[in-house]
């Protein structure tokens, strides 16, 4: 219930007027609100304004004015005295109002400080008013269909008690609906009932309320990279108009068509015309590039650096250290992408996930639910199980493929699970789960089942730990007790999962299956974003981690552009500027080798004989980079101006030169944003774009200086063919003697063939000269096709995911795109054709995996607004900037940079204490970026200042927040975790002397103990699929043992459920692919004699396998006890193959090998008949006997149905006839149960 409060009694002051202006620019929303409050009390009161912060929202402006005095705020670094004051009060979770310390300060816990802005506003006169003006920027959430949801904070539209009797709402603009042209019903019928607020309101949560109606005005401008297809509101009637004097419908003005009734919050749905296409948006900075360069050159520290070293690379390095501070001054590009992840039939069976089941030791009574969940998993998933109490006891060292052996081991372990006493360590189990190695194309899903009652300190630590690793996994939590609901709810919100709460006596199975269905929904994982920008630009990329995308999620990437060509050393006379080596790629070519020198030394030139090197090596140019710790300490002052020195080993992302085109105006620079750090990488943020003087001598490239900031550049995949797919102007004349004719010929052929000068690392081009699309030539390792194969089929299936108009290679033969041959030194060059230079552009390539299928999207945007439309130079004056909306894209970029540095600082503090320098630099960058851009940070706190003098108000109420302190229990939890595997039979290799008194007290034979006791040795590859354990005797669980143990514990579990859900014995028999076997355990699970199943089978081989006596007498089926004894429940007398061969088979004379292979084929065909018939019967049995529990076995049935659809049925039978025969079986069984004669029925299995 946010709003303006009197802190002495925490009573809200009523709102009298609310005026809101909004600006929706693509996925970003800017808000400017003016709120007027009235003090009804006869004495002055102190005001405290409470504003709810959305995720990644930035409040860039705040001003409270009363009686001519204006109060604003600034972000200051947190002081050590705040931590001591907050620790004295404890975490304070669940409090509804801010607490007060002994000094009278308002104290918030870290969760409250992250989600709420609490600011003192000064005194409000008796019967006076206070006007609060607020400016903020936030990201708009999206829905799975790409619709963006605009919801105003309830502090702008508080719920007020309606005037009774109320006048009826006038009809809207449309005849069918007053709210939109999309047919949404009138909100008049959905008006919520007024509820009187409680005596002590919760200022941190809940909708805001007002005791009386107020006036409200609203206006919103909507623009974006694509046109708006429509808009609607489920709450209000809207009016949409074009702007006055507008020449197009690119910007829409939205207002309210009817008066605001103060009974609901305002919501608007925006329908873009291209909801599932990537888009780029450009927002200019507060300074032009010329103004920014002049401002930097006027700095005293830059002038001192210029006096010591006038080199251009040193000046560029100076700029790189300031990137995070100058975000608001330079232009920003924003990438927005909401992929279409609508589910397709059969996607559940093809889903690739890693599922970790984290079971509280006190939840041993829910064994059936775990068994059902594991049996419902597709065969392509990875699975692991961990029991946690005071110790974390995983079943496997790392996740294993969901094979029959793995599922059997999990089920047998669950059967012997005993209740574990002791308080569960939530922090330790989260540390174990999130610390497991990641597997490529397998997004992680955690299922946390617990009845724990965590303390406030544990809850605080667990939530902060999940916030540090929020993109690593989704958490689906199940609260078995009410004490842990708040913790599990917050964990699910942070990880984009979902929380489920069980009432007493409620079954866990339906909720667990519902969560499994959501966990297996389509997803994009292993996302990498490649930015191609002009060589004159350096880029700061954020966020540093890109999590997997699920339906409704959108990818937002920010790129802050810094034009640095005015600071670089230009090429010497006689050298063509295009010869400068490109340092904008983090992907090495196969022939490029690192070599580092100390600062101040000359680069090492490594030449090769002509013809032995590649074009990339011959067109590269080196420049010196050091690698000395002493130089870092001497040249870097992390306190005054933090940032890694170019020679810093601990702060450098290794960046490799990449050859590119020889262009007249600029060379494209490659920057990559990916969630996967590469080998030898530590942490950095920007794409390199610096370059040194060119050299045609074919020298090896060296390490360029790293750049500070909050964006990691990753070694995702080789990018030998990653030049920007843009039309290339003809090269300008240059000195021909620098290159031989052979080199020039190879350069021309390479440019015409593949638009790149090097192959992907580790392999050569399969066919030299073959045209390759730039979005297809660099596929993630291990996932792309073999050399010579293409991804056309997979990308066509994804719905034309490439750019709408990719560059056709046939265009290169047209005059405007033709690379003209360069004459040799003996020939005279013809006069170059004067063509207008190409305008600079930025190009972005998004690569991801949907399951195991590579996907790719491309989008580009022109940078004419920054360079001007003409010759590529800076225009004299930039277009009019939208200063009224306070640079929303810039603010969100800065907020993402702050979040990146917070994670680096806090993770480094939690993982190790050795790299204090790197942690301190990240900490300082977060503080500096937060102060400059007003982006919130856990290292800063808002302080009330005078809006005119910008000085801190003396005597003003101070709001402090708790410190994001180190997890005090982390080290102890890690020690317990490390000791847990050694104390259990699961991980103690070769432990044969009995199990410890832990959760895994398994009562198995020697084979199963050996299978569990052999841990998987850790591998260095954390992105590949874990190796399947070798097939040996210790992993060979016999078929007889598997079948006999399938019904173990059945009676006990059914009695625990207290209901008649008897599908679990059948589910236990399902194999990992989804099939069932026609054998005795299956017949016992469905309670149908095997002879009856064979008689009703649509396969003739099954009916022929019956004994002649039983086949000749219908009474043998109607009354098994008459004349047959127990023969009806016996197995078929002969196997299908032997029944068809007969007893008198002789040698065919065709050889033993031929007969053996034919016999194997007959056996496989017979097994397929039995499995398909048993699977169809299992599906029909579930539909007829367990229809009430459909929500529990639907995933199992879906897996079985997908397996059936993938089979090629023998004997010419189709799937429809097979399922019809299975359904007819239960009709026949009903007549059999009624003891009717078989010849009276109009049914024959052969006619189905």
Swiss-Prot record:
Residues 184-204, 590-650, 672-710, 751-789, 1008-1037, 1126-1168 are annotated as: Disordered. It comes from the Eukaryota. Residues 1159-1168 have a biased composition (Basic and acidic residues). InterPro entries: VIT, VWA_domain-containing, VWF_A, vWFA_dom_sf. Residues 1-138 form the VIT domain. Residues 595-619 have a biased composition (Polar residues). It holds the Pfam family VWA_3. Residues 684-701, 751-764, 780-789, 1127-1145 have a biased composition (Low complexity). Residues 354-527 form the VWFA domain. PANTHER family: VON WILLEBRAND FACTOR A DOMAIN-CONTAINING PROTEIN 5B2 (PTHR46299:SF2), VON WILLEBRAND FACTOR A DOMAIN-CONTAINING PROTEIN 5B2-RELATED (PTHR46299). This is von Willebrand factor A domain-containing protein 5B2. It comes from Mus musculus (Mouse). The lineage of its organism: Eukaryota, Metazoa, Chordata, Craniata, Vertebrata.
């Amino acid at each position: 219930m946010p709003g303006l409060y009197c802190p002495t009694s925490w009573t809200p002051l009523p709102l009298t007027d609310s005026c809101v202006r909004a600006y929706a620019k693509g996925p970003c929303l800017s808000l400017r609100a003016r709120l007027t409050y009235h003090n009804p009390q006869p004495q002055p009161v102190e005001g405290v304004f409470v504003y709810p912060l959305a995720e990644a929202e930035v409040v860039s402006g705040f001003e409270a004015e009363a009686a001519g005095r204006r109060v604003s705020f600034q972000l200051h670094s947190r002081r050590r005295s705040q931590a001591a004051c907050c620790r004295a009060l404890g975490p304070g979770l669940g409090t509804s109002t801010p607490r007060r310390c002994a000094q009278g300060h308002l104290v918030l816990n870290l969760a409250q400080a992250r989600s709420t802005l609490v600011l003192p506003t000064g005194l409000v006169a008796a019967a006076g008013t206070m006007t609060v003006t607020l400016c903020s920027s936030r990201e708009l959430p999206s829905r799975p269909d790409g619709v963006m949801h605009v919801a105003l904070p309830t502090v702008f539209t508080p719920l007020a008690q309606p005037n009774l009797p109320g006048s009826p709402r006038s009809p809207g603009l449309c005849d069918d609906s007053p709210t939109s042209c999309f047919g949404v019903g009138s909100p008049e019928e959905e008006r919520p009932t007024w509820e009187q607020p409680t005596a002590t309101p919760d200022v941190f949560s809940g909708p805001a309320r007002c005791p009386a109606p107020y006036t409200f005005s609203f206006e919103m401008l909507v623009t974006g990279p694509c046109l708006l297809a429509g808009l609607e509101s489920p709450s209000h009637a809207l009016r949409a108009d074009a702007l006055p004097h507008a020449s197009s419908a690119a910007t829409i003005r939205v207002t309210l068509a009817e008066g605001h009734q103060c009974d609901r919050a305002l919501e608007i749905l925006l329908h873009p015309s291209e909801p599932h296409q990537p888009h780029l948006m450009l927002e200019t900075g507060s300074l032009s590039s010329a103004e920014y360069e002049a401002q930097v050159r006027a700095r005293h520290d830059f002038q001192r650096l210029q006096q010591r070293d006038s080199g251009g690379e040193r000046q560029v390095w100076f700029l790189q250290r300031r990137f995070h501070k100058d975000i608001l001054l330079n232009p920003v590009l924003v990438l927005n992408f909401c992929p279409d992840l609508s589910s397709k039939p059969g996607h559940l069976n093809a889903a690739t996930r890693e599922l970790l089941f984290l079971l509280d030791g006190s939840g041993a009574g829910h064994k059936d639910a775990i068994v059902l969940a594991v049996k419902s998993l597709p065969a392509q998933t990875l699975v692991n199980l961990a029991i946690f109490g005071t110790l974390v006891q995983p079943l496997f060292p790392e996740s294993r493929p969901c094979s029959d052996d793995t599922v059997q081991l999990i089920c047998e372990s669950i059967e012997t699970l005993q209740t574990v006493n002791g308080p569960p360590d939530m922090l330790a189990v989260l540390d174990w789960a999130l610390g497991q190695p990641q597997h490529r194309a397998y997004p992680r899903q955690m299922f946390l089942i617990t009845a724990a009652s965590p303390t406030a300190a544990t809850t605080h630590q667990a939530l902060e730990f999940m916030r540090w690793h929020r993109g690593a996994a989704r958490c689906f939590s199940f609260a078995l007790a009410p004490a842990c609901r708040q913790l599990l709810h917050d964990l699910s919100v942070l990880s984009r999962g979902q929380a489920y709460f069980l009432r007493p006596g409620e079954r866990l199975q339906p909720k667990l299956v519902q969560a499994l269905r959501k966990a297996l929904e389509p997803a994009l994982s292993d996302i990498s974003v490649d930015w191609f920008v002009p060589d004159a630009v350096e880029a700061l990329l954020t966020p540093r981690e890109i999590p997997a995308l699920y339906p409704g999620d959108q990818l937002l990437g920010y790129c802050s552009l810094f034009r640095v060509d005015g600071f670089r050393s230009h090429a010497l006379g006689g050298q063509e500027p295009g010869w400068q080596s490109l340092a904008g790629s983090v992907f090495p070519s196969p022939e490029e080798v690192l070599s580092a020198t100390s600062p101040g030394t000359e680069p090492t030139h490594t030449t090769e004989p002509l013809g032995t090197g590649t074009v990339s090596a011959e067109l590269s140019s080196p420049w010196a980079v050091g690698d000395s710790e002493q130089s870092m300490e001497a040249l870097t002052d992390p306190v005054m101006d933090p940032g890694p020195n170019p020679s810093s080993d601990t702060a450098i992302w290794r960046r490799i030169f990449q050859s590119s085109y020889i262009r007249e105006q600029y060379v494209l620079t490659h920057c990559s944003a990916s969630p996967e750090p590469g080998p030898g990488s530590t942490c950095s943020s920007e794409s390199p774009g610096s370059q040194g003087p060119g050299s045609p001598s074919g020298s090896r490239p060296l390490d360029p200086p790293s750049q500070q900031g909050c964006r990691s550049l990753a070694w995702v995949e080789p990018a030998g063919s990653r030049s920007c797919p843009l039309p290339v102007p003809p090269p300008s004349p240059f000195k021909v003697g620098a290159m031989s004719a052979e080199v020039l010929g190879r350069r021309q052929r390479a440019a015409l063939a593949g638009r790149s000068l090097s192959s992907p690392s580790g392999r050569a081009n399969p066919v030299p000269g073959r045209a390759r699309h730039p979005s297809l030539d660099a596929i993630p390792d291990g996932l792309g096709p073999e050399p010579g194969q293409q991804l056309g089929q997979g990308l066509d299936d994804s719905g034309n995911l490439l750019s709408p108009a990719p560059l056709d290679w046939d265009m290169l033969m047209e005059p405007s795109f033709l690379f003209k041959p360069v004459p040799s030194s003996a020939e005279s060059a013809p006069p170059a054709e004067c063509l207008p230079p190409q305008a600079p552009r930025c190009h972005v390539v998004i690569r991801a995996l949907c399951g195991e299928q590579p996907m790719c999207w491309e989008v580009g945007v022109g940078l004419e607004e920054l360079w001007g439309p003409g010759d590529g130079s800076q225009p004299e004056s930039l277009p009019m900037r939208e200063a009224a909306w306070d640079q929303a894209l810039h603010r969100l970029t800065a907020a993402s940079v702050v979040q990146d540095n917070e994670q680096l600082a806090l993770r480094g503090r939690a993982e190790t204490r050795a790299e204090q320098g790197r942690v301190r630099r990240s900490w300082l960058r977060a503080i500096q970026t937060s102060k400059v851009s007003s982006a919130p940070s856990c290292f800063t706190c808002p302080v009330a200042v005078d809006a005119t003098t910008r000085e801190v108000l003396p005597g003003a109420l101070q709001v402090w927040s708790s410190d994001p302190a180190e997890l005090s229990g982390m080290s102890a939890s890690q020690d317990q975790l490390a000791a847990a595997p050694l104390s259990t039979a699961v991980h103690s290799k070769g432990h044969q002397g009995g199990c410890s008194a832990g959760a895994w007290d398994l009562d198995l034979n020697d084979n199963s103990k050996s299978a569990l006791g052999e841990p998987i040795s850790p591998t260095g590859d954390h992105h590949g699929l874990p190796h399947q354990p070798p097939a040996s005797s210790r992993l060979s669980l016999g078929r007889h043992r598997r079948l006999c143990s399938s019904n173990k514990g059945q009676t006990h579990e059914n009695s625990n459920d207290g209901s008649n859900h008897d599908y679990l014995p059948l589910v236990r028999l399902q194999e990992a692919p989804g099939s069932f076997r026609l054998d005795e355990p299956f017949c016992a699970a469905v309670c149908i004699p095997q002879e009856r199943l064979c008689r009703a089978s649509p396969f003739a081989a099954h009916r022929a396998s019956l004994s002649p006596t039983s086949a000749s007498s219908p009474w043998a089926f109607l009354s098994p006890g008459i004349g047959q004894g127990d023969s009806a429940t016996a197995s078929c007398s002969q196997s299908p193959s032997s029944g068809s061969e007969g007893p008198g088979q002789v040698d065919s004379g065709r050889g033993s090998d031929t007969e053996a292979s034919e016999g194997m084929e007959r056996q496989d065909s017979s097994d397929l008949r039995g499995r398909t018939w048993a699977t169809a019967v299992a599906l029909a049995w579930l539909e007829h006997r367990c229809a009430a529990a459909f929500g529990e076995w639907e995933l199992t049935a879906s897996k079985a149905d997908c397996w059936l659809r993938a089979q090629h049925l023998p004997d010419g039978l189709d799937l429809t006839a097979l399922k019809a025969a299975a359904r007819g079986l239960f009709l026949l069984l009903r007549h059999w149960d009624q003891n009717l004669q078989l010849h009276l029925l109009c049914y024959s299995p052969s006619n189905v």
